[in-house]
Amino acid sequence: MEDFHHVTVLLKEAVAGLAIKPTGVYVDCTLGGGGHSQRILEQLTTGHLYAFDQDQTAITYNEEHLKTYLDAGKLTFIKSNFRQIQTELTERGITQVDGILYDLGVSSPQFDEADRGFSYQHDAPLDMRMDQSQKLSAWIVVNEWSFNDLLRIFHRYGEEKFAKPIARAIERHREQAPIDTTGQLVEIIKEGIPAAARRHGGHPAKKVFQAIRIAVNDELGALEDSLEQAVSLLDVNGRISVITFQSLEDRLVKTMFREQSSLPELPHGIPVIPDNLQPDFKLVNHKPILPSEEELAVNHRAHSAKLRILEKIK
């Protein structure tokens, strides 16, 4: 199978953040090109890694790429959305783990494979499904969702300030004929954005494409579900490393980690906080870890990456 061409972002930092024990049990929730998985596996002796991906392409590639570890019995692939983490691990007899890693960037091959429809740079059928077996696609969102639903996702998931004129333009065009390709959609989005605004702030379709992709794959819902399960799966001293690439995901992770590591509301004047009220988790880094200048120089996709790490302390 052809190479995955996926440059892993914050590779050293995210795996170091897990404080790998050679005998531990670890989960890579986003296998992708296998960069993080390989780095974890290199440090395991009798430990084991469970690697999730809902994209069969990633699993097929890594069956070859990580064959040594597979043959040695150190690696199990799970073709599933990471929102099923607890169910899938329980079915395999795993109820506690030492570390869980999430890399929430769409893997480069999904962007680069024109026919998957993730990219506004290539003309392709409107698709954007991470899991090719699911029914909901970008075509259905663009052609069948109501004006109000489009408005909601462009605002909420794209933070697009021209959401209304863009949704109107889509509505107008699809009344004439279905919108079938990413190229058509890009041109329609441009119609909804004033010419002066199109000259600044990156590609005019970027925010709308992000919004549709998040809606098609229920990315924020899946992340929230998965993180809630992840904290209950961690053993004491276990850690979760999460790499985000956009503000919505980062805000969700930041809020959740803060809630897990904060004291409950207590009456004023308590001199000593009893142990049973102390939080079970602590933030390993209070501010997100960002890519180094060297990494930014070689990987332009790294510029928006942020790494947050949570540790279970009791």
From Swiss-Prot:
Its EC number is 2.1.1.199. GO terms for biological process: rRNA base methylation. InterPro entries: RsmH, SAM-dep_MeTrfase_MraW_recog, SAM-dependent_MTases_sf. One of its GO terms (molecular function) is rRNA (cytosine-N4-)-methyltransferase activity. S-adenosyl-L-methionine binds at G34, G35, H36, D53, F82, D103, Q110. GO terms for cellular component: cytoplasm. It is an enzyme of class 2 (transferase). Its main location: cytoplasm. Keywords: Cytoplasm, Methyltransferase, rRNA processing, S-adenosyl-L-methionine, Transferase. It catalyses: cytidine(1402) in 16S rRNA + S-adenosyl-L-methionine = N(4)-methylcytidine(1402) in 16S rRNA + S-adenosyl-L-homocysteine + H(+). It comes from the Bacteria. HAMAP family: 16SrRNA_methyltr_H (MF_01007). Belongs to the methyltransferase superfamily. RsmH family. Specifically methylates the N4 position of cytidine in position 1402 (C1402) of 16S rRNA. This is Ribosomal RNA small subunit methyltransferase H. It comes from Levilactobacillus brevis (strain ATCC 367 / BCRC 12310 / CIP 105137 / JCM 1170 / LMG 11437 / NCIMB 947 / NCTC 947).
